[in-house]
Amino acid sequence: MNKSFLLLVFLSIVLGCGESSNSNDSNSTALETGFNPKCTTYNATITIYPSPYEGTLRRCNTSDRQFYVYLPEDYSEVGSSYPAMFSLHGYTSTALTNMSYTGFMKQADINDFVVIYPQGLVHETKGGTHWNTDEIGPGNSVNSIEFLESVLDWVGQNYNIDLNRFYSAGMSNGGFMSYHLACNITSKISAIASVTGSMSVFSYDNCNAQPTSVMQIHGSVDTVVPYDGTVSASGVGFKGIEDVMEFWSSNNICNIEPSIEALPDISANGVSGTHRIYLSLIHI
């Protein structure tokens, strides 16, 4: 059977992560809110396909939250500031796992940007690490927006980062959260990318975003986050991908009809794809 995808994406294989050479960083500046994580610097070997990648990570902890910061090899506190991005893991996953399959560390070294890998908390009633965008139901007081905005503000204050070029990319639930950030702290997010994510009904119905570039990568036969979405009788769930693209096309004042490019079956396994681009009529 021929399977059709919006975009054909090859993800790296997750194998593991090692670390050595710990040192403490203690000269960070706290936010006015009191957010001031303590960071440890260590050399990490991230095992991804086809070969391990080595780099220096900063693991930052508050009393109940954690995130990692990766600075490019040529990072400097003087001179031009660096763009930065969140890389958000999926439901039940971890920041370290996300670090392994995304390959952003290598890309950061090549293209000079900073990557932040935050760690989600366990859902209070469902279990499993997550980002709270309400797509998996009520009974959850975790404030993911507050945490991620604090991390964004803190790294902007403590590293040479251009806060006018801050982005978010996420896998599955991390994709949901990237949309949620674009809706809730819209002035701080330049663009987002979602891989197999969507928008929760709550995000969709309450989104107050300024024009923001988005990229969605999704399988049309995805059974975990179905392409057509799913909403319960109580209104909990997430929107279909066509609805999400229509929302952002309108929000960004884009052409009604996208340009469409067929993607070839380069693996000869019956899987093809379609690339759709909605161009904005304004400068974003």
Q: What feature does the model see in each segment?
A:
Residues S4-I13:
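Sec-dependent N-terminal signal peptides
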Residues I13-K38:
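Bacterial Sec-dependent N-terminal signal peptides
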Residues L31-S76:
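N-terminal cap/lid segment of alpha/beta-hydrolase-fold proteins
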Residues N61-Y75, G79-Y167, M177-H180, N184:
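Serine-hydrolase catalytic machinery in alpha/beta-hydrolase-like enzymes
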Residues G90-T94, G120-T125, S172-G175, G197-V201, ...:
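Solvent-exposed loop/turn segments at secondary-structure junctions
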Residues Q157, N164-Q210:
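Primarily recognizes the serine-hydrolase "nucleophile elbow" in alpha/beta-hydrolase
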Residues S190-I260, P264-V271, I277-S280:
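The feature captures the conserved acid-bearing segment of alpha/beta-hydrolase catalytic domains
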Residues I282-I284:
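Conserved small/polar residues in nucleotide/adenosyl-binding loops
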